[in-house]
């Protein structure tokens, strides 16, 4: 199979840079990255999935990398994020795809079968589980849960605040996010992340002694270079739509995901400290499987590329896509 290529695709009023691999006409797999990442975060999976016979489309999603970065906060709501990827299917003439997402990309792919049921053959999500609709706006729920404690999602809500911290030193931001996130069992790290006070998000993450074994300096520099050029505001604006997404999807209350679904997470992912995997049954009515990778952290498809790719291929093989 040839090496992955890059091209620009106009979709849903924005232009996305898309990494593409595999034969046109083969079953399509969309790979949706999270925060603060890029299509590059799927660099290990893209060639492997293409070699297995799939047509892979991995965009820099809106707000990131080589893609459009609209100024309006509401331009990053869940309706637009899912519609962007539907537009990629239209571009290649595909009726449906398997939607795979990590972190915020997982939120996008969990919503896709609810908003665009006819365009989704199956869903695979990493790190962020499927959750039932909250009874109150999400930021209200977070404030009730965390009180006066620091919580990064609430910190991200005010335009300009987190932007200034993260944009001030993109190398520090990426270094600490990649190497400074600690597993749920690290109590001192948990206390530091929750402690009330003026410190920002990156301030609370430890400066790693060195890079994790799973990422090279060259790979980290790719992220640093892109975020130095673009800043982090586009990605932060996704967080600023939590309540808007809740308000504008009220009609989805009670609807469930009926397509085959896979959830993959690392047991050392700090996201699992404030989400519950056991509530997936409340929103998923179709076939569902969960894969937990022992000791893996948040940057799952980069930390454990072989295990993630194997889980995805096993899932894909069991689907009737051809």
UniProtKB/Swiss-Prot annotation:
Coiled coil: none annotated. It is an enzyme of class 3 (hydrolase). It holds the Pfam family Abhydrolase_1. Its EC number is 3.3.2.10. Keywords: Detoxification, Hydrolase. Residues 27-131 form the AB hydrolase-1 domain. Gene3D superfamilies: alpha/beta hydrolase (3.40.50.1820). GO terms for biological process: response to toxic substance. The keyword Hydrolase applies. The active site is at residues 103, 298. The record marks 269 as: Plays an orienting role for the imidazole group of His-298. The keyword Hydrolase applies. Homodimer. Belongs to the AB hydrolase superfamily. Epoxide hydrolase family. PANTHER family: EPOXIDE HYDROLASE (PTHR43329). This is Epoxide hydrolase A. The lineage of its organism: Bacteria, Bacillati, Actinomycetota, Actinomycetes, Mycobacteriales.
């Amino acid at each position: 199979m040839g090496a992955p290529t890059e091209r620009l695709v106009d979709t849903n009023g924005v232009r996305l840079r898309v990494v593409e691999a595999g034969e046109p006409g083969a079953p399509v797999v969309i790979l949706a990255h999270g925060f603060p990442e890029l299509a590059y975060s799927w660099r290990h999976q893209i060639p492997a999935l293409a070699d297995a016979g799939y047509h892979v489309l991995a965009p820099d999603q809106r707000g990131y990398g080589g893609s459009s970065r609209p100024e309006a906060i509401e331009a990053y709501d869940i309706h637009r994020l899912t519609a962007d990827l539907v537009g990629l299917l239209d571009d290649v003439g595909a009726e449906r795809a398997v939607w795979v997402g990590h972190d915020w990309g997982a939120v996008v792919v969990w919503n896709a079968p609810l908003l665009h049921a006819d365009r989704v053959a199956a869903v695979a999500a990493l790190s962020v589980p499927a959750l039932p609709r909250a009874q109150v706006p999400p930021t209200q729920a977070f404030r009730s849960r965390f009180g006066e404690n620091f919580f990064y999602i609430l910190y991200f809500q005010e335009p300009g605040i987190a932007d200034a911290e993260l944009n001030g030193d993109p190398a520090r931001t990426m270094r600490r996010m990649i190497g400074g996130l600690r597993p749920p069992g690290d109590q001192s790290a948990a206390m530091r992340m929750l402690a009330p006070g003026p410190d920002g998000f990156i301030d609370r993450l430890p400066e790693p002694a060195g890079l994790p074994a799973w990422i090279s300096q060259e790979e980290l520099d790719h992220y640093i270079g892109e975020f130095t050029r673009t800043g982090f505001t586009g990605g932060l604006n996704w967080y600023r739509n939590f309540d808007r997404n809740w308000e504008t999807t009220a009609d989805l209350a009670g609807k469930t995901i009926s397509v085959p679904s896979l959830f993959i997470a690392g047991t050392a992912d700090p996201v699992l400290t404030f989400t519950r995997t056991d509530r997936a049954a409340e929103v998923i009515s179709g076939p569902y499987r969960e894969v937990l990778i022992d000791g893996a952290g948040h940057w799952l498809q980069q930390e454990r590329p072989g295990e993630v790719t194997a889980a995805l291929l096993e899932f894909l093989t069991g689907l009737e896509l051809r």
